[in-house]
């Protein structure tokens, strides 16, 4: 079993079998270029997980409390919050188990610990897949609300949204189970990478199309009211900035992790790739940072949700 928290498996779960390690990470003693390794202390890792846990729990509680938020759009936001919550919980659980094992406070048989590691692996992987699917579902929901506004309520019903969410979780659990089973197969790694790229392309296409449509609509209104051209440009720049932040956060937080998976499949023994593998803990921390940012982008911008959140906080006190 690994002796330190930095020796994590592919998904950040606990890898206890030495025979599995070569599949997940190349040997650390390879000769090659000097590596830059960014250390993420366990304390910081735990703090990020706790912030994400509290933040996403509040989002779920606010949506559950207010019946006005029981709409398809907020169902997808709630699904995203639940996924992000599980990402933080699974990483918190993993870090806690590793720390307890390191200090000798937790004693267990190797088979029991291995089974626990597999459970955490499945939990982490399924929550990550469902989080990506939820981001794609939110983008599609917003796209339909703009381009099919008159038919939106007949296309995106609450029942269909719930079925879509159920399908997302079923697919996430199934895919994560298969991935953990065949983690040492290159095809399994590439499937996850292709899935991430598909979500990135889907979100980029949908949001760019929405931005173009919004700019055209703003120009039409400006011509109608005979506004000045700089006003139109300012609105377009604001929309472009919002789009850049939305897609930029997604890519910066998730991209390094999937780059890690790609390099494991492409160059597992190359010295340069080995340098990147040493920062795997940082890549997991970036994903947890994304679970902290998601509520700020998708949930807390809603005035109704913020009002309900205040009520939840006041009630808890």
Swiss-Prot record:
Glycosylation sites: 29
Membrane-spanning ranges: 38-63, 73-93, 119-140, 164-183, 192-211, 241-266, 280-300
Subcellular location: Cell membrane
Kinase is among the record's keywords: no
Principal place of residence: membrane
Positions in the Cytoplasmic compartment: 64-72, 141-163, 212-240, 301-317
Biological process annotations from GO: adenylate cyclase-activating G protein-coupled receptor signaling pathway
Complex and partners: Interacts with MGRN1, but does not undergo MGRN1-mediated ubiquitination; this interaction competes with GNAS-binding and thus inhibits agonist-induced cAMP production. Interacts with OPN3; the interaction results in a decrease in MC1R-mediated cAMP signaling and ultimately a decrease in melanin production in melanocytes.
The protein's role, per its UniProt record: Receptor for MSH (alpha, beta and gamma) and ACTH. The activity of this receptor is mediated by G proteins which activate adenylate cyclase. Mediates melanogenesis, the production of eumelanin (black/brown) and phaeomelanin (red/yellow), via regulation of cAMP signaling in melanocytes.
UniProt-recorded name of the protein: Melanocyte-stimulating hormone receptor
Organism: Eulemur fulvus fulvus (Brown lemur)
Upper lineage: Eukaryota, Metazoa, Chordata, Craniata, Vertebrata
């Amino acid at each position: 079993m690994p002796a330190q928290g930095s020796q994590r498996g592919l998904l950040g779960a606990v890898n206890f079998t030495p025979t599995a390690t070569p599949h997940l990470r190349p040997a650390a003693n390879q000769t090659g270029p000097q590596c830059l390794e960014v250390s993420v202390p366990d304390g910081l890792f735990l703090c990020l997980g706790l912030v994400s846990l509290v933040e996403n729990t509040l989002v779920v509680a606010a949506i559950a409390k207010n019946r006005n938020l029981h709409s398809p759009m907020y169902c997808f936001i709630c699904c995203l919050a639940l996924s992000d919550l599980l990402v933080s919980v699974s990483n918190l659980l993993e870090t806690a188990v590793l720390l307890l094992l390191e200090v000798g406070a937790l004693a267990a048989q190797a088979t029991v610990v291995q089974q626990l590691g597999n459970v955490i692996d499945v939990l982490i992987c399924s929550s990550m897949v469902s989080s990506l699917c939820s981001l794609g579902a939110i983008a599609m929901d917003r796209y339909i609300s703009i381009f099919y506004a008159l038919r939106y309520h007949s296309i995106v019903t609450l029942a269909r949204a719930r079925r879509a969410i159920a399908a997302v979780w079923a697919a996430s659990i199934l895919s994560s189970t298969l991935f953990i089973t065949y983690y040492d197969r290159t095809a399994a790694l590439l499937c996850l990478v292709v899935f991430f790229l598909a979500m990135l392309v889907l979100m980029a296409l949908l949001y760019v199309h929405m931005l173009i449509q919004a700019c055209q609509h703003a120009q039409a209104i400006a011509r109608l009211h005979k506004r000045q051209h700089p006003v139109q440009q300012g609105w377009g720049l604001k929309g472009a900035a919002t789009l850049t932040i939305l897609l930029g956060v997604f890519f910066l937080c998730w991209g390094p992790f999937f780059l890690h998976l790609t390099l494991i499949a492409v160059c597992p023994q190359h010295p340069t790739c080995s340098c990147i593998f040493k920062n795997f803990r940082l890549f997991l921390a970036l994903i947890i940072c994304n679970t902290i940012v998601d509520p700020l982008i998708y949930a807390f911008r809603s005035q109704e949700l913020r009002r309900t959140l205040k009520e939840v906080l006041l009630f808890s006190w």
